[in-house]
Amino acid sequence: MTDQIEIFTDGACSGNPGPGGWGAILRSGAHEKEIWGGEPHTTNNRMELLAVIRALELLKRPVVARVHTDSQYVQKGISEWIHGWKARGWKTAAKAPVKNEDLWRALDEAASRHQVQWVWVRGHAGHVENERADELARRGVDAVRRQGAAVAG
């Protein structure tokens, strides 16, 4: 039987661009793992993407995953927009380069190994796991500010 995993992710940025952080919670049954990290000069969207990428990369074998994100950019990007971007050679409908192409490619690759359902949740609306993922992302921002360099925990 294929493992089923719930993943809750969030990204945060102090300034946009500015120091940023990402956080994720991976849950399989009663087991949970928290991961987080940050970068000194980034954007909120990059941190939202990186949270999902790092969570999916942590999985050692193919799983059925439900990824919960409060980022419509991530949810719509991976489930709707990416198909057109790829068909147009990573260009938008307006023929502009896709922003964060490097991370979209990485997310596409990481997600391709799994059966993923993308779930959007309203941020800062009392969703317990989303609030926890936000705390992890803010931990990443704080660590970057203290160390002045990229971090992971």
UniProtKB/Swiss-Prot annotation:
Q: Where does Mg(2+) 2 bind?
A: D10, D134
Keyword Ion transport appears in the UniProt entry: no
Q: For this protein, what reaction is catalysed? A: Endonucleolytic cleavage to 5'-phosphomonoester
Report residues binding Mg(2+) 1: D10, E48, D70
| Listed Gene3D superfamilies | Ribonuclease H-like superfamily/Ribonuclease H
Q: For the RNase H type-1 domain, which residue ranges apply?
A: 1-142
Compartments where found: Cytoplasm
Give the EC number(s) listed in the UniProt record.
3.1.26.4
- Name residues in a coiled coil: none
Annotated GO molecular function terms are: magnesium ion binding; nucleic acid binding; RNA-DNA hybrid ribonuclease activity
What keyword terms does UniProt attach to this protein? Cytoplasm, Endonuclease, Hydrolase, Magnesium, Metal-binding, Nuclease
Domain of life where this protein originates: Bacteria
Extract the InterPro entries matched here. RNase_H, RNaseH-like_sf, RNaseH_domain, RNaseH_sf, RNaseHI
Q: What's the cofactor?
A: Mg(2+)
* Single GO biological process annotation from the record: DNA replication, removal of RNA primer
Question: What cellular component terms from Gene Ontology apply here?
Answer: cytoplasm
Q: What does the record note about the cofactor?
A: Binds 1 Mg(2+) ion per subunit. May bind a second metal ion at a regulatory site, or after substrate binding.
- State whether it acts alone or in a complex, and with which partners, per the record: Monomer.
What is the similarity comment for this entry? Answer: Belongs to the RNase H family.
Function, please? Endonuclease that specifically degrades the RNA of RNA-DNA hybrids.
This chain belongs to the protein called Ribonuclease H
Q: Which gene encodes it?
A: rnhA
